[in-house]
Amino acid sequence: MRYLFVGDTHGPTDLGKLRSPEVAALKLGARDAIIHCGDFGAPWRQDMDEVLGFWRQVPAKVLICLGNHENYGWIMRQPVTRRYGCQGYDLGGKLFAPLPGQTATLGGRRFWFYPGGFSIDFFLRQTGVDLFGDELLTGEQAAAVMADYFRRQVPDYIISHDAPRSFILKHFGFPIRLPPDAYYAHTGERTGSRAHPAFTLDPIYLARRYNKWYFGHHHKDYEAENLRCLYRQMVLEDSLTGETRIISPAG
């Protein structure tokens, strides 16, 4: 089985990499899977659009780790079903978004999903239209997910949208901070009620309790310490041959 790991596509904005000749040449089919690291962004501001139609026609399985630029108002109305040994949202076609902390099994490999991200541009967005409090788990949800993670065997892959805070500070030099009070005033949420994923995921990184880790959100292509940030580049892995390839669309 082949897995194509993909970073942010933001609806149509960064979808070109999936429509590139380099991806077409892979001839991904029903036995393959695309693992999307979030900011899927389809549909956007409505219940159906051309981008969602594109994704629903993809022949490969598509598993989405939801980000912050998502239409949560629509997503959370979709049916929750069981697929690949875990619970998630059925988004139509072969699109599936695992719930937080769920582990999907594909081709004998185990993928643990932690969705969500903080929209630093929240003040430019309209709550309930292109900004949703559900982009972040509640503190209680995050604590339960993490407690469950540390009780279980380490998965083959962690798939998240954001990355551990300590990793980002060390490698990108960016000191991630908690959402400010203004964020909660803007979203109508209780101050401090939501968990920033970079802080939540940090204990996993600091304990080195992971094998491979893919994430997006930071709009970089970068790899260190078995963590890889995806944006323009994609990664193809083959579970049978063990081959790993970097897919870099031209232009």
Walk through the language-model features, giving the residues of each:
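Active-site-proximal loop/helix segment associated with metal-binding centers of metalloenzymes
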Residues: 107-196
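Conserved beta-sheet core of the metallophosphoesterase superfamily
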Residues: 61-65, 84-90, 167-251
